[in-house]
Amino acid sequence: MKVMNPRKTNNTFMYYFVLFVCGFVLMEGCLGQNQTTEIKVGVVLDLHTSFSKLCLTSINISLSDFYKYHSDYTTRLAIHIRDSMEDVVQASSAALDLIKNEQVSAIIGPRTSMQAEFMIRLADKSQVPTITFSATCPLLTSINSPYFVRATLDDSSQVKAIAAIVKSFGWRNVVAIYVDNEFGEGILPLLTDALQDVQAFVVNRCLIPQEANDDQILKELYKLMTMQTRVFVVHMPPTLGFRFFQKAREIGMMEEGYVWLLTDGVMNLLKSNERGSSLENMQGVLGVRSHIPKSKKLKNFRLRWEKMFPKKGNDEEMNIFALRAYDSITALAMAVEKTNIKSLRYDHPIASGNNKTNLGTLGVSRYGPSLLKALSNVRFNGLAGEFELINGQLESSVFDVINIIGSEERIIGLWRPSNGIVNAKSKNTTSVLGERLGPVIWPGKSKDVPKGWQIPTNGKMLRVGIPVKKGFLEFVDAKIDPISNAMTPTGYCIEIFEAVLKKLPYSVIPKYIAFLSPDENYDEMVYQVYTGAYDAVVGDVTIVANRSLYVDFTLPYTESGVSMMVPLKDNKNTWVFLRPWSLDLWVTTACFFVFIGFIVWILEHRVNTDFRGPPHHQIGTSFWFAFSTMNFAHREKVVSNLARFVVLVWCFVVLVLIQSYTANLTSFFTVKLLQPTVTNWKDLIKFNKNIGYQRGTFVRELLKSQGFDESQLKPFGSAVECDELFSNGTITASFDEVAYIKVILSQNSSKYTMVEPSFKTAGFGFVFPKKSPLTDDVSRAILNVTQGEEMQHIENKWFKKPNNCPDLNTSLSSNHLSLSSFWGLFLIAGIASFLALLIFVANFLYEHKHTLFDDSENSFRGKLKFLVRNFDEKDIKSHMFKENAVHNVSSPITQGSSSPLTDQSTPLPRSPEQYRELELRRVSSISSGELFTTQSEQVEDEESAIIQCEGE
């Protein structure tokens, strides 16, 4: 019998054992290639709502589609569903259960923004990415959790689209209507900022409770009816929004003139309600909705959806959130496949109890960071458009601008972040208001763009504050009946305001409210408009910069400027007739009178007997002739052409001088020579003079800013008080606006005057709240009133100007006419005179050239004396004397008579001048020697002719 070796038996056993183990390992490896890893994903939704049912259906379809086309993936998402029961606490409890008990790697949900806040904090603590496709509140971003992923657009992305619509139609004010929770409040700051960027403003807010009943909704709607603004931006959940518009239609707020702008909170889910009733109540509404680009993939999905719900109702209508849910699951499945699944476990702290919901035992996922990183890198074209996460959420996308018309949701435009609103069909990007959108049908089936505001017709009157003053009642006078306490406002400002209201294209009924202030502080009255106590302020309110910070002013309806008023000094003067001309003009004129008289004497002395005779006679005649030209009363005739030329030019100069003198003297008597006591306001500061200002006005601060000391400022409340301060010497000058100064001057025109404006202001204007729609219309109406005759009638009624009051615009500065105004005339007269004199001298020297060149008289002095003697003689060759001589010869009286020099029996009477002239001729003839013999007969003939002429 053969005995086996024990050692050999052991080796054989070991061989088979190793072979078995290797085979088992190889088998496990082969089997592992066909196995997948399950990734737990929690889903928290309100399962009893149609919205959640649609989204859950979309999630299941997404999982089926994804793994159908990616069967080779080694990971599979396992969905664990929890019902949040439309409750914030229940949603947080569901998330806590998924994290603690199921140890999910990610959570999808919740449905609302309110449910999401605490869930995000739990997920952040456990490092579990929470992906929401429907929580759009911008406030969730402030949690600043890296594990919060928003696979949808938040509400901040649509506010710029809404602002673009407001800008496109030129509206300036809107009313924000939103649900009273985090969802509604989150959009308001962003909407306000976006509207301000386009110069529009949220002027009022209306909060609607989430669970509001019909009575609460109606109460808020009636409040909206009392507001002037008719542009409403509505942001609320669809269920509340549908009831809101139903009530708005019932009370007539869906008629012409109203503008309703809806956010995508309602527009994205329009089809989730009974289609007919919801759209019927929202005719003419504009809204924005996330734009879903067309694609083949989306088209196929819609066909499959319709097959799944062949008899679909509105509850089964596919919406943008169902598409977002589909894309969210797709993105998560893609991210999971790219991660390392070896870290699929939680790190748990030491438990402090057996309570399953104890937050102290909440584990931390090791897988969360890698999954979050992979998710942020996912990018693909989904059903709702491009899917790419930027900072944990989708980027701002394109929005459709929707107009609800009948049963249709007509797309009339698109809004893009890059170029704003464009026409949906023409892609027009013109900047003209309203032309970027297609035709819009507004509420009430109107095609006219609403102006965005109107005066309420519910009986509410415009509350107008007016100041109660003690003085200057011409502007505003609030008369209060002590018995009935009824107020009757009158005055210039009131009448202007009522005239302006009549020019408006609609009816505005003012209700005047008296503003009583001990110090008549206008700043405080204007501030009441800012607080809402008044709808407007009417009165003598000046437009100044600090007031315009919190209210709006209309265009001014009065003159602008702050001027200085000073007393007049009456400069009555005996020598007032000398005032029109300055001293240099008087002296120059007098010198020219003498000069012209001298020139005329030179030109006329040899040919005109009026300018001959004794020296004193000739001097008197010359002066008389020259000065009598002032009134053209000279009786002497000029016979020389040169003298006539000089006199003609001089008469023109005198005419201009006399007319100017008369006009200026008249103006001096018109203003009565009144002069201001002060002309420079800076002198008041220099000499520390007291000045007055109207109590309660901005003038006080203006004067202090210009350097006036507080002790110099003396207030007054009326024109009478101002006159008293001047009369008793308390003030030297007063500063006030031009309108007030005119009132004072109309009562005391002979005592004070207004110096030119020192400081510029904008004048009086009406006050309205910031961005009030009335401001522009009232400003346009002011232009119509001020440019017409009605304005002048109102001014004449309240500011009657006395007949003896000088023109306030008349300059009281020096109006002396100086030589500089007439030097051209004097230059012409001087040139004409010297030219005539030069011609005369040249002719005279030419006639006596034989004397100048005669060698018998070598002495220059002798020749000069000879020329002087000849100048003093009559020019017998003159046409004047020749004419007289011819007349004497042909006269029948002298015909046949003897010479008067030889006939001594019947001498003709001779004047002393005639004797003097004959004597001079004889002396001249004797002294000339040889000339006497040659010219004696001629002299006798001349004497005879002269005597005969004078005898006649």
Curated annotation (Swiss-Prot):
Q: How does it sit in the membrane?
A: Multi-pass membrane protein
Compartments annotated for it: namely:
Membrane
The family database entries (CDD domains) matched by this protein are listed as: GluR_Plant (cd13686), PBP1_GABAb_receptor_plant (cd19990)
| Region of interest (Disordered), ranges | 889-914, 932-952
Q: Which organism is it from?
A: Arabidopsis thaliana
Extracellular membrane side? 33-582, 659-821
Q: Per its record, how is this protein called by name? A: Glutamate receptor 2.7
Q: Which residues are glycosylated?
A: N34, N60, N355, N428, N546, N664, N728, N748, N784, N809
Q: Which residues lie on this side of the membrane: Cytoplasmic?
A: 604-612, 634-637, 843-952
Please describe the organ and tissue distribution of this protein's expression: Expressed predominantly in leaves.
Compositionally skewed regions (Polar residues) per UniProt: 889-908
Instruction: Tell me the keywords, alphabetical order.
Output: Glycoprotein, Ion channel, Ion transport, Ligand-gated ion channel, Membrane, Receptor, Signal, Transmembrane, Transmembrane helix, Transport
Q: Give the protein's function.
A: Glutamate-gated receptor that probably acts as a non-selective cation channel. May be involved in light-signal transduction and calcium homeostasis via the regulation of calcium influx into cells.
| Membrane-traversing stretches | 583-603, 613-633, 638-658, 822-842
Signal peptide range equals: 1-32
Q: Which PANTHER family match?
A: OS06G0188250 PROTEIN, OS09G0428600 PROTEIN
Q: Which Gene3D superfamilies match?
A: 1.10.287.70, 3.40.50.2300, Periplasmic binding protein-like II
Instruction: Give the GO cellular component terms, alphabetically.
Output: plant-type vacuole; plasma membrane
Q: Does the keyword Signal apply?
A: yes
Concerning its family, UniProt says: Belongs to the glutamate-gated ion channel (TC 1.A.10.1) family.
Quaternary structure (record): May form heteromers.
Q: Which gene encodes it?
A: GLR2.7
Q: Name one GO molecular function term.
A: calcium channel activity
